[in-house]
Amino acid sequence: MRVRTLICTFGFNEKKVLVAMRSIPYSRLVLVAGKDVLDGAEYRLMVALEEKSGGTVETVIVDPFDFADCYDGVDRAIRSHLTGGDVTLNISGGTKILADAAILAAFQNGVEAYHCEESMVKLPVMRGVRFEDAFSVEDVKVMENFVEGDSTKSIGARMPDLSDASLRKSLKHLERLGVIVPALEKGEARYHSTPGHRDIAALAGRCMR
């Protein structure tokens, strides 16, 4: 019999997780949360309710303000329970950073994801498509070498092994993806990063290794 695991991001509001627990069938509950949450009455309530129903709570501790750490924690939890079982993710609890990292981990692993508050909303997850498919090796190198306010010339000077054509192609691609944005400054195009640029670069690079 396949085990059905429900993984929930969790903060200081137990109501969102309770909606998921009522709406999504599961036999094992995993909470992904920051260390501070463990001392809260909300967390103790979740553990007590699950134990009362004959279950246990597995807790994965992450830094809820560190995108990469959140992603790694959720990704490990998903992978560890996918073997011989099914995994469903609820991302309605915790910080926005934790929720964003969790949905990306769901995307990477092709598992169903929901956002549960007053009602349950299924999130789009494409099976067979992975995060790193959006980026070329050159794209990752450009992201890793990028400095705020760079021009094409200044980036190219730090990446002599990349041809001018390949560099311009990567910059245009990253611009289309919304990772960087160009701005005309003193007659020259300079690039600025969007929020999460470093996290995206680190994650894309790690996925390709």
Task: Give the location of each predicted region.
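Long, low-complexity, Lys/Arg-enriched
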Residues: M1-D86, D100-R209
